[in-house]
Amino acid sequence: MVPNLDLETAIQIISSLETQLSELEGATKEYENDLEQVISKLKSDLLESQQQNKCNKKQITDLEIQVDELENENIQLRNKIETLQLESDRRLERNVLLEHELLDTKEALQKLRVSKEEATSGETRRNTRSLPSQNKKMKLFKDTIKVSTTSSTLYLQNMAKTNNAARSHCNIPNTQITQSTVIATTSSV
């Protein structure tokens, strides 16, 4: 049951309610505007975040491609290093073998020289030749030799620049070494 109100009180209540309604409508519009601004800001942030996400995905894809390329390049470089290391080891081993062959050849040459000196000194005693001609023979005999190699052979060649008669007294036959023994080997880790 509604209490009895006089007209003036009812008008005041209606006026007060209209004022409250007007204030509520203003507040509602203000909240709606604020809410629209928040929604608009969130949409803008979402779009920006999506764009940033796309950029990040593209960067990640690019970085993964670069990582794959670098890994492939790294594998190729490691293979090249292993190949070069093996080649270096083979060359070092070959050099060691050639050095030993050269030392053996020098020893053989020295033995030939000693034998030649002994033969020449014995011949000198028999022929009573003068000492200067003996020294000349020794000088001719000590001329340089040429050392050359192929893939598996070491060659020695007399390089004396003398006439055939003199060369026959100090002849070092062209020597060829085709067999050797492996003394040391190298291996890659």
From Swiss-Prot:
Gene3D superfamilies tied to this protein: 6.10.250.1080
Main location class: nucleus
Entry GO terms, CC: cytoplasm; cytoplasmic microtubule; nucleus; peroxisome
Sequence segments annotated as region (Disordered): 114-139
One GO term (biological process): nuclear migration along microtubule
Keywords from the UniProt entry: Cell cycle, Cell division, Coiled coil, Cytoplasm, Cytoskeleton, Microtubule, Mitosis, Nucleus, Transport
Localization: Nucleus; Cytoplasm, Cytoskeleton
Coiled coil region boundaries: 4-121
The keyword Transport appears for this protein: yes
Composition bias, Basic and acidic residues: 114-126
GO MF annotations, alphabetized: microtubule plus-end binding
Family: Belongs to the nudE family.
Role, per record: Required for nuclear migration to the bud neck during cell division. Targets cytoplasmic dynein to microtubule plus ends thereby promoting dynein-mediated microtubule sliding along the bud cortex and consequently the movement of the mitotic spindle to the bud neck.
Assembly: Self-associates. Interacts with PAC1.
Protein name as catalogued: Nuclear distribution protein nudE homolog 1
